[in-house]
Amino acid sequence: EKAGSYTLDGLILSNEDNGIIYHAIGVNGTKFSDYTKFPRFFDQLAAIDPDLIIISLGTNESFQTSYKEEHLKTDMDLFNRELLKRKITGNILLTSPPPSMKNRKNINELATAFSYEMGVFANLNSWAFYDLHSVSRTSSAMPDWYRAKLSSSDKVHFIEPGYRLQAQLLIEALFNSYDSYRE
């Protein structure tokens, strides 16, 4: 008998215990437009039926010279339409790209502009928004992060301590938001 072929995209192992079930997807260089090319991603997201979806994109788009704010708005809108089409009801938290540098010396102004546009988009679509530019207190924070040994020498990517700090700050923001909600 000939065996059929199949594709295994992922596997979820869980039990009946309370707690967080965490899923992650992403590849270095991924952009909003990469996800919208693959409807199956949204089908699988709907099957998981998450309570919270955290979207952290925008850095890669900000390094494309021909990619502007209008392109970002279009790509975010297409992404959102795919979510709506599948009636995905989980809360969405959009995070902005962090401050970064181009060629190790110039502020990535597009990342700053994208951060603003993402905040506007999140507000218009009732998504929560976490602005890494505001958390950093300035668009030129990357050299400080580098001097603090939190980012790599390219002044775009973080190293483990930097990612850990970002995670800690995000977790604190989530808990603070939840505490405010409970009050």
Feature locations, PLM:
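Hydrophobic positions in alpha-helices of CheY-like receiver
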Residues: 79-83, 122
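Active-site segments of SGNH/GDSL-like serine hydrolases
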Residues: 54-61, 82-115
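Well-ordered alpha-helical segments embedded in enzymatic catalytic cores
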Residues: 40, 75-79, 169
